[in-house]
Amino acid sequence: MTLVKLRSGVTLEIEISGSAGDPLMVLVPGAGAPLDFWHPSYVDALIESGFRVLRFNHRDTGLSDHFDETYSIDVLISEMWELIDQFEARPVHLTGHSMGGYMGAISMLDKRHRLSSVTAISAGPTMDQSRYSELRMIPPDPSTWGVLIENTPSGNLSADLAGWMKSWRFLNGDVEFDQEHALAYTKALYRGDPRNAQVAVNH
């Protein structure tokens, strides 16, 4: 991983892999999620498929700069494109998870000429019950948020670990739980500024 300074003066932590001549795949994490969200095996598979891969940490994540003042998703999108401009002038592929998916979708409004594709994962619309019924969709179980908001990170990994692991086990469902991977990912949330793990609360 390395640090890159943007035109705006903000420094982001990034990792770029693969051959410079290959099409660029930009992996955009969700709010507060580190670039480690994108597992190395997934990155390797993309490289083997002919992509150059860019992973990065948003501000307030990893070793990227930390900010106490609030900001909008538009700021994150602008910084993402400043970063992309340093590596690729051709159209790129964006794959985003959660907030990262929204960043890709919003980019389609005024950056269509810079995009080869956009893939949004777990970035669905906000709908009321009537709209779910109209589309014949099943709404999220209300108890899901109840479990997740029980986790209130303090910025201290030792104190917070049990809450994170409870959340990961819940989200994992009935699939075999990879505790080693979950622990490594949780530790990645606390890299850099100790306030990073509270980014969802702060912003």
Predicted region positions:
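Catalytic nucleophile-loop/oxyanion-hole region of alpha/beta-hydrolase
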Residues: 65-77
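Conserved acidic catalytic loop of the alpha/beta-hydrolase fold
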Residues: 74-92
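Conserved HGGG/HGGXW glycine-rich cap/lid loop of the alpha/beta-hydrolase fold
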Residues: 6-66
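Conserved hydrolase catalytic core segment
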Residues: 90-133
